[in-house]
Amino acid sequence: MVREIEKQQGAAFKLKKGQRLKVIDPRGEQVSDMVLFNAHDTREKISSGKTLDFEETILITKGHFLWSNRSNKMMEILEDTNGRNDFLLAPCSPETFKIMYNNSGYHPSCFENLHTNLKSFGIEPDDIPTAFNIFMNVQFKEDGKLSVDPPLSKAGDYVLLEAQMDLIVGLTACSAEDSNNGSFKPIHYEILG
């Protein structure tokens, strides 16, 4: 059954070892932030540093694993029809919009959506790690300068992942304008198996 995360919203759910998660961009150019926690000990969580280190690339896609802070495999990426994801940048937060966009008012954020949906699992704001940003198109120049460009994902693109342990998953439809080419759209997901 395909479920929808409305624009600028989030969801959290459990995934059993061996189950598959399909994250779908139904309209194109929409990022989805994903965080993972060990369902039996939430101190173990997805780690950008360990993943980039062990996979020896900053371009995480089909054939790669997402690793935990305890050096355990959490998910394997089985399929990725877009091929461009980010694992460098933190989930957008209220502070992101104040510091980077000079936004003085309230703005929805992935960080808030992750925390709001994960708090029923006992996960606190300080527990939220760097997210695996599905469909996010971060470019980097030779001098190290980063830029967030419009996603390359088209309507119907998806990433299929398989759980390597029992997981708690946090997932969003990203709230940052620059990450989504200036518009906000839903994200679909499906749990298989």
Where are these regions (language model features)?
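Acidic, Ser/Thr/Pro
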Residues: 1-193
